[in-house]
Amino acid sequence: MKNICALFDMDGVLLDTESQYDIFWHSMGEKYHLGIEKFEKKIKGTTLVSILSNYFSHLPETEHDVIKQSLLDFEKNMTYSDIPGAMKFIEKLKENNIKVGMVTSSDDEKLSTVFTQRAGFDKIFDTIVSANRITQGKPHPMCYLLAAKDLGIDPENCYVFEDALSGIQAGTDAGMTVIGLATTNPAELIRDKVSKVIPHFEDFSVEEMKAI
């Protein structure tokens, strides 16, 4: 039997946070007069470094620091609840001796906030790849390839769970099987870009995953 693993994005896949981030980034787009329609949707799945570089490069570094601090303060007051069925699905994977990794565009400071609120959350993963471990963020495949290397699993034997278009692209370009969660984007938007679309993890089994 071949060795396989499951790799999960965090926000919008394991944790129900994306609607909260919509509020923050919409306000930033308004505050700095970016004039980009649905700006909060365009940046989904990308790192803070990428967001600042791609959309706020016209601002001085001091203003970047203001945005960073505003985000940190916002994240400390966020609610980090589960996507339905996520934790139970991971439990089933581990019962089947399938390695589990988390691959997120969040940096270590954000993860520290999450792990403080969710004691033991970090302990369920065999590897964690954060923005601090990579030089090129999603949609580049570096993060997923690094996770596969950490776990000693060939990319073609990795299952990726993603909600954002940038993450879906990263998993696809890494040569992995991508399963899309219709949490951030409607199913119709991602259906032709993934092997399967699920609304959440309830009623989704390890056997179904392996059959894809």
What feature does the model see in each segment?
Residues 25, 89-116, 171:
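Substrate-recognition element of Asp-dependent hydrolases with the DxDx(T/V) motif
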Residues 30-35, 62, 95-96, 119-124, ...:
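Short helix-capping segments at alpha-helix termini
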Residues 20, 43-47, 84-85, 106, ...:
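Short beta->alpha linker loops
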Residues 14, 41, 100, 136, ...:
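Conserved SAM-binding loop
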Residues 1-41, 58:
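Active-site neighborhood of HAD-like aspartate-dependent phosphohydrolases
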Residues 37, 53-91, 96:
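Metal-dependent phosphoesterase signature
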Residues 28, 47-59, 114, 148:
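Helix-loop "lid/cap" segments that line or gate small-molecule binding pockets
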Residues 1-4, 107-108, 113-212:
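Asp-based, Mg2+/Mn2+-dependent phosphohydrolase catalytic module
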